[in-house]
């Protein structure tokens, strides 16, 4: 089996449907004896350029290990799902399990936020 990194962008009006979509794609991979090495929900982000007059979209990234047939099935599902605006599949040399730079950036923001929140109450008191 081969390793792939898949990123797909979901229409912002369909953000509530993202967990169900992820479960369906996970089911496709795991149902064919594949593995999911990393699954990250990057949330709603600004697009680099408008797609169908939309400026923000919901991003999801998956690192999977699966066969060619499973990958074709997932890409076929992306093409016929109107909520998926764009998708990109990259073949990887190995399984990637460490956090992506996007998640490291979010974690850094989260680590900074509690410190600033903790500083505000003491200043107000």
From Swiss-Prot:
The GO cellular component terms are: cytosolic small ribosomal subunit
The record's region (Disordered) falls at 101-125
UniProt keyword annotation of Ribosomal protein present:
yes
One Gene Ontology MF term: structural constituent of ribosome
Role: Binds together with bS18 to 16S ribosomal RNA.
Which family, according to the similarity comment? Belongs to the bacterial ribosomal protein bS6 family.
Q: Which NCBIfam families match?
A: S6
Q: Mind telling me what this protein is named? A: Small ribosomal subunit protein bS6
Species this chain originates from? Laribacter hongkongensis (strain HLHK9)
């Amino acid at each position: 089996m081969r390793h792939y990194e898949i990123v797909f962008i979901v229409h912002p009006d369909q953000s509530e449907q993202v967990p169900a979509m992820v479960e369906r794609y996970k089911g496709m991979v795991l149902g064919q004896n594949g593995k999911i090495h990393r699954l990250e929900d990057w949330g709603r982000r600004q697009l680099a350029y408008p797609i169908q007059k939309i400026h923000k979209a919901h991003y999801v990234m998956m690192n999977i290990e699966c066969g060619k047939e499973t990958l074709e099935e997932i890409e076929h599902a992306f093409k016929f799902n109107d909520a998926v605006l764009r998708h990109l599949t990259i073949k990887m040399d190995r399984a990637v399990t460490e956090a992506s730079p996007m998640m490291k950036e979010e974690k850094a923001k989260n680590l900074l936020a509690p410190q600033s929140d903790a500083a505000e109450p003491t200043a107000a008191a």
